[in-house]
Amino acid sequence: MSRMATSEYIGAKRRAYAQADRAKRTRILDDVCETTGYERKYANRLLTGSRKFRERKGRGRTYGYDVAEVLKKVWREAGCPCLPYFKAEVGRWTEEYATQVAHIRPEIKAKLLAMSDRTMSRLLSGEARVKPGWAKGNKRSGRGGRNEVKASTPCASGESVSAHRAPPGDVQVDTFALGGGDPSDNFFWILDVTDRKTQWTVLCPTWNRGQHATLEALEHIEGKFPFDILAIHSDNGGEVLNHHVAAYLGSKAKAPFLWRSRPRHSNDNAHVEEKNRSSGRQLFGEARIDCPSLHGELVRLCDDWSDFRNLFCPCRMLVSKEKRPDGKGCRCRYDKPRTPYQRLLDEHVLTPEQEVSLRAYRAKLSGMDIYRRVLKRLRKIRRIQAAYAKAKHEGKDLSPFAARPSLALRATPSGTDGLHREGTQHAANNQHMSHAEERRMSVQYLANQKTPSYLQSVFSI
């Protein structure tokens, strides 16, 4: 049948189809399908006069444009964290935003609290993460030569004992460079100390990784930890494994256990290596900072950033890791996101006075306020560093950028003609100590240190 004949035939059957009962409609529909060869549902639509599909109306949008805009603003003010971590603390972030930045309507706040991290990811798709770090490209050169302290320090993987079995106070130590990819001349390094059990991390700048500057940074970091340090696990670098630092550790009433990574096993210090990136490089990027006068600003910046990361930023820890049945990769399981502050309180290792003091310190701080202060300090450091680099390139006087005598910068700052080369005396007790005395105390400390009970299965000293 031609198309015109088919159309006339359908038109003739349509009126009879409309007036027929159910049984007659079935027979008419059978005849039309047999005559035209049409599929049964299509023929039924032609006979009833319904030629178009009626699309089903879907469910309306739960989170509209207004909710998405508020989510973007709160997320940016919180420092653009990963969304599972943002979801874990979204209640506190929305409260801080509502009290410090702008009012949030109750219905929008309720939707933000009910939203899943996957929905947040969908609403924030295409949004660029604004991170404080800057610049790219950095390489670290190695060191050679025999180190007596290194040879006397027990050696094992920092992951020999699971982080879940280690008590708070088992820390890992590492440094990373702010040299901008150029290892020549002098510049700042960052000393990074991370507790394995709670993930409590503190950063502090040090000039050129010298033993005196490193010890000052280590003492400053000890004061930022709310609990005692029981053990220090370092890589094989000489900034920590030296007689000066070892003598200081041995002079303490509760001397921590010092041990190190295995040679050529870069993942033995895995927890602090990960924090070098998530806490350190996220802040500084790969920039070069070599202006000596920036030491004080860098200390204050690192203190603020450490408080922000420890008190307000959740993190996850690996619970189990097993190979897949097909042998392709591993299946990793993590615990629920919690801040290092929450993890520390859950361990119940603090005295009542320490816990009250820590809770009071946390209560008077605001995460968004700290983050804005970090960005402000970072802009100031960039401005001073740019002025210093320009003056150095043009051969101008660099004395305005020289370090103050109170800073123990043992190496000569770039272009300062030996200003403040002498540094300060022993940072531990401000008393002069000969190298021979330091070496004697260091050797005695390393020979007599006792292995903690949770590491007995790793060492037999």
Give the positions of each predicted feature.
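Secondary-structure boundary/capping micro-motif
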Residues: 1-231, 236-461
